[in-house]
Every structure is written in structure tokens, then in C-alpha cells.
Amino acid sequence: MSEFDDAAVRMTAGADAISEASALVERLNDDELIDLLDGDVPFWPGITDMTSGGYYRHAWPASRNQRTGIPGLAFTDGPRGVVIGNATCFPVAMARAASFDLALEEQVGAVIGREARASGATYFGGVCVNLLRHPAWGRAQETYGEDPYQLGEFGAALTRGVQRHVMACVKHFACNSMENARFRVDVTASDRALHEVYLPHFRRVVEAGVASVMSAYNSVNGEWCGESPALLTSVLRDEWRFDGFVISDFIFGLRDPVTSVRAGLDVEMPFAQQRANELRRALAAGELSRADLEAPALRVVATLLRFAAVLSASAPPITVVASAEHRALARRTAQESMVLLTNRDALLPFDATSVRKIAVLGRLAAVANLGDGGSSAVHPPSVVTPLEGLRAALPDAHVMHHDTDAALARDAELAVVVVGYTKADEGEFVDPGTSAALFGLFPPMDDPRLGRDAPMPDLPPAPPSAPLERDEAVMAVGGDRRSLRLRPEDEALIEEVAAVNSRTVVAVMAGSAVVMPWIDAPAATLLLWYPGMEGGHALADVVFGAVAPSGHLPFAIPRDETDLVHFDADAAAE
């Protein structure tokens, strides 16, 4: 057994994690100590692998030490499922918040943790609890709404479930509630606003025992979040007594490696990038002491020891990934997430036995529309589209489908219009112009330790992946929304279909609020969200009464965009 394993055994007999971790950290030489404080993959080989799809192929290793047996981290992302391999894709987090079912969210977390472990990961970075300040935020779908209490309770539930199998990480700490300007915006907030509005949900997840916290890209009150002693030390550790470790957001999460160590950031993710050379220089120059470097290493190793019993258990077989049981939970979650916004004359539930002819319209009806295409993207082995779900529920009916031909609805017993957004309209966003200003954070391409020719370390085993066909017309652009309304052609289609068929149901796919000036035209309106791999079946279940639509909005929907304050997506007012 390794030295780490011996320490883990002593932990089961009542040994103290800090004492055992201290003994291990003291055994590390200076190079090993510094290597514990960033990713294991050198930057240029790593970024090449990541941008060619590696983000979705394997977990990302960090903080390993082979000599002492410190296992380190094997990171995968979320939150709608495990992003590596072909995992179960649940509805997005905002949809799950609409269920108001904490027990269900904990079950979702347990499945995600189980699939993460089966896929070679030990660390899940998908507990996102950033507060929804404005529905135009492009990554609203990854969080749970606009209420700090609900955010905290759902984040805690997901954490409890995930940590049955792997470590969890809550993100993005803090005030990361806009996308386009996240790399440069400075959020100014009073202590009262921070502690009453923007931080309580993080505290709740910390109190639930989360292993780790991820800092945010933006700055708060003049300090980059990855270099903020106010956030990472004063609030997180001194006030909240957090005893886990802190990682940076990926690639652009810190600007000054030395300052980040002093502030309380423990691990630079996901590569050996800025710290690898700069911390060696700072240690040699006396800018940092060995004790400065031992403190973050101690927090990482102590957390690994606390989770040793969970992580040393045998990993589930890969067959659990997207298993029938997990798909069934994805379907149930989509059912409970759906929100019935209007239902004139009790149109729903509709009697399926009376349907001889149904018109399914809208450009999203036959699209595998799962949400954001960035770091949270999940690639399930199959997706049930709204059209497929409705067709499966009506095996004897004539199902007519067209993206735009409203006339199809004229003679149908029921018309269903599927409209909304895709990953092209909202989601994660890296502006090439903005990222160019951050290229200075990259090491030289010929760096012997981090450059193109640096050797790749052994990576965690990658699960098998099957390709999934996608609608090639749906291109990932994302970012913050420029409007809260549907596309003009979608709004026009709704009006046209409702004008020729009084039994029209509109299903809206989105990650947060949509302004609906057309809402009185159709008989019924459902908020379908990005409903996951079983969303089409869940839609049919609700429309035809197999289940009741029990979801409730986790935010307010304004009647008009002007009812909200201006959303300065580009931080142009700074």
C-alpha cells in the first residue's frame, strides 16, 4: 500500500485528517509540492487535446503524486449530467428547480455521481448556484433560479447525492451572473448585498459538506475572484469555516499565480499553466515560503483523505451509464419539471384516444435540443425529441410535421407548436476578441515543461463513446441573450397556428424566462425547458395526461422586457 493508503486506513481508526495530511505533505520535495497545486497535464498538449474534444472524452487529472500515492483529482463537469462519454442527460438545472423536489434532485445527484465514477472521474464540478440576476444571462439554465434560499437548498441536495460516489465542487464563487463580459467585469457590491443576496446559497452548500469550491472569472470589488483574500479566506474559511479546497475556473481563472496562493486559491485548473514555472521562481526568490505552498497542498490532501472511503470503493460498471433505470429517472425529472403556464377551457390533458390526426409544428420539434453546447454539454446515446415522443404516444394516429406550415393544423384534432431557444441563442461563450487579451496567461509554446513537446501524463481511463447525430443547423454560439422574446418567425407561427386551430398547445424550450406577448393566442402553453434525453416522452406524458404538469416557475416572467432593468451584457457602462 502507498503512504496515502496507509494514512487513509488510519483515518478509519479515528486519525485526524489534518495531521495525516500534514505528514504526507511534509514528505513532498519542493517540485512535488508545487506540482500538487495545478493540473497534471502540461498546457499546450492539454489545450490541444481539450479543443479537439478531450473535454468530453476523459476526466482531467490534477494534484496527483505517484511516489506517495496521493490520488489527486479526476475532474468532470455538469450539471445536467456527466460530460464525458455518453452519459444520462437530465433536464437542465433550472428545469429541475421548477420541480421544487429536493429529494428528486438528490436522486439526480446520486445518478450523476455514480456515472461520473463509472466513467473514470472522482470529482464533479457541476454544482452551479450563481444567482439569476436577469433572465438574459446566457448560462441561467445551469443554476436554480433567483432566490438564494432555493439555490442553496437545491445545491445542497445535488451535493449530497453526488458525494455518495465522488467529490463535488460548487461554483462559480462569486457574483458570476453574466456571460459575455465575465473575463473582465468587476462586480461592485456592498457587504450587505453580498451576504444577503449573492453568497448565502454558497454558504448553504458549504454547510452541506461540499468538498470543493470553484472561483469565478470576474472580479468583485476590485479583486479577481481567484485572487481575492476577501472571498477565499475572510468569507469562505474564516466566517464559514470551510475546510475543503478551492480550484480556479478553467484556463483564465487567475491572473497572478503568487497572489492566488496568498489569497487562498489551492489548485490552478485544469492544466499546469501559470503556476508551474512562476511558483518555482517565487520560491527560489523568497517571495513565497515553503509554508505558503504547504497550506494549499494540505487542504487538498486532507479533503482527499476525508473522501478516501468513498473513492476507494469499487467503481460501478460502465453499464450503469445511461442505463434503463437512469433514463427512467431522466424522464420522471422532465415530467416534474414541466410548467403549465396557461390552459384555456382545460384543454389539457388531451384524450389521446380521440386523436386521429395531430400537427406537430415548429423548428425545434424534431431537434435534439439539450441546451448549452459548452462545458456543461452532455452527449447521451440517444435523445427523444418532442416529435418522437408525441409520435410514440399516438401509434395509430396520423402525425403531420413541418417546421413552418401552419396550414397543417387546420384539420387536426390537436396542434403542438415547439419553439424557443437553442445553444446558438444562449449558453457559454468565449469571445475571440476577449480571449485574445488573455493570451498572455499562456506559457510559451516552446516551454520545455509546458510547451507543445511536453510529454502527456497518463490520463484517467476514458469511457467508450458512441457518436450522436445532431442537427447540424444548430451551431453553438451562445452568450447572453439580446432579447427575452422568441424569434419573430416563432411568434408568427404561434399566432398563425392558433388562428386555424383552437386546440393549439405551445411548448417553449428555454433556460430561463421568455416574454410571451402571444400567450393569449394558444389554448395551452407549457414551459418545456431543455428537458434532457427523455424530454419528448415527458412532453407526451403531460399532454395526454399520463402525469400532471406539477412544475412551478423558479423565477418571475415579466410581461414586457421593459419591466426589467437594463442588462448590460457587455459591461459597457464600466
What do these predicted ranges mean?
Residues 1-574:
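Glycoside hydrolase catalytic-domain context in secreted enzymes
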